[in-house]
């Protein structure tokens, strides 16, 4: 699925040796299946692992990937390019921008959950956060809840209005309103 060169694997092993024990690697795609798709690699602590993640085994480390983006990672490669100037990781995912997965979700709730998992949560996961759809009320209000680094973050108002709400209302015209039902408590888990 993801071919990681020996040089890149050794680079990851070196980086992970400087992180807290149990820290692994996460591969993600922001806006998968669109022309704006962007691939990325980040650290993944044990607390960041989700039930829907797939664990890939490599020499001395694991890579976690959200199950919903697997089709976009077909034939992907991560390599470490070393030259006179320095070194740089390269990540090639030829299917990242293709609308490769079929939308099989039947209900509005399933379609919004898929949308959040594929388009919003990859961005929020870079800050250790996530947004969940709790339910859709009878008056077509989407009730959502933020978890992880988003809970108690001082930027949550901007994230809610400028990213989550704007995108849900734009992609799902049947939704009239988005309400955040998170009990925001600022703490060490909060990103800002």
UniProtKB/Swiss-Prot annotation:
GO biological-process terms attached to the record: iron-sulfur cluster assembly; protein maturation
Keyword tags: 4Fe-4S, Iron, Iron-sulfur, Metal-binding
InterPro entries (UniProt xref): Fe/S_biogenesis_protein_NfuA (IPR017726), FeS_biogenesis (IPR000361), FSCA_dom_sf (IPR034904), HesB-like_dom_sf (IPR035903), NIF_FeS_clus_asmbl_NifU_C (IPR001075)
Pfam families: Fe-S_biosyn, NifU
Signal peptide extent: none
One GO MF term attached to the UniProt entry: iron ion binding
Cofactor(s) in the UniProt record: [4Fe-4S] cluster
Cofactor annotation comment: Binds 1 [4Fe-4S] cluster per subunit. The cluster is presumably bound at the interface of two monomers.
Binding residues for [4Fe-4S] cluster: 150, 153
Keyword 4Fe-4S: yes
Family: Belongs to the NfuA family.
Subunit structure comment from the entry: Homodimer.
Function comment: Involved in iron-sulfur cluster biogenesis. Binds a 4Fe-4S cluster, can transfer this cluster to apoproteins, and thereby intervenes in the maturation of Fe/S proteins. Could also act as a scaffold/chaperone for damaged Fe/S proteins.
Name of the protein in question: Fe/S biogenesis protein NfuA
Organism of provenance: Buchnera aphidicola subsp. Schizaphis graminum (strain Sg)
